[in-house]
């Protein structure tokens, strides 16, 4: 797949503080790429440099192999959608969507045609004459997205656009965004701290920490094969166990809990259940390993967990193939 954006050894300094040390990243044309990390990791700064709102201190940004470090945002063929939608309150939906085209002196007939298609894609046709104050948060977000895609950008940049919405609406819009990206075929670069959001929408995920890229991969690769201690502890839940000079990670769904009355493999250790936590369709057992004193997590169905009580002695273990060695 063709590379549309290349980030080559880019750094960002604010005064003497290095926010992003040398960082390189290739972004493929037509992919949904999510930059994921905790607050302060540099993900939004990286997005703003790609958009042209921040200038790299060192290194180069390339679009279609052309250097764009000094190119102003409006010449980059990219649009940016923020968490705060910045809609014009005195304009209705259609006029908000057409505003950028009007400034670019696009013919009125073409404005209408392109706005119509953008509203169709974002399910806004019935709201075209409403002003922002008469729209829900999700509808306002759709207007911001429609306004961003109506100019046919090469790349759409999204900075935590769903962060202010409630859980159910967020889930609905996640599906809509992924379908929209698939239908448009343009590159989406999405910034979030929400792991579930990243996992559900992305073709690839870039996990950042303290300005560094910890790992790049598909959602399955990131979840099943974390490369570093940070990724293993940041993405989902993991049991981190000392193994010689390093560590291994074992997902709770791979940890087995057995009765002390069962014949057991030698790799299993004696432990006792310290707590049982209800987590929806599963129950989470906290088991203290008597040999290592590690507190291990194990997921079980409600039916499996019904046999246990806090304080029970059990055997706990896992298959070696379920261990992931961490750097």
Swiss-Prot record:
What this protein catalyses is: ATP + H2O + polyamine-[polyamine-binding protein]Side 1 = ADP + phosphate + polyamineSide 2 + [polyamine-binding protein]Side 1
One GO molecular-function entry? ABC-type putrescine transporter activity
> What SMART domains does the database record attribute to this sequence?
AAA (SM00382)
Positions with a binding annotation for ATP? 37-44
| Keyword terms, alphabetized | ATP-binding, Cell membrane, Membrane, Nucleotide-binding, Translocase, Transport
Q: Just give the chief location class.
A: membrane
Q: Which PROSITE patterns match?
A: ABC_TRANSPORTER_1, ABC_TRANSPORTER_2, POTA
Concerning its family, UniProt says: Belongs to the ABC transporter superfamily. Spermidine/putrescine importer (TC 3.A.1.11.1) family.
State the protein's name.
Spermidine/putrescine import ATP-binding protein PotA
Q: What is the organism of origin for this protein?
A: Bacillus anthracis
Report the gene name: potA
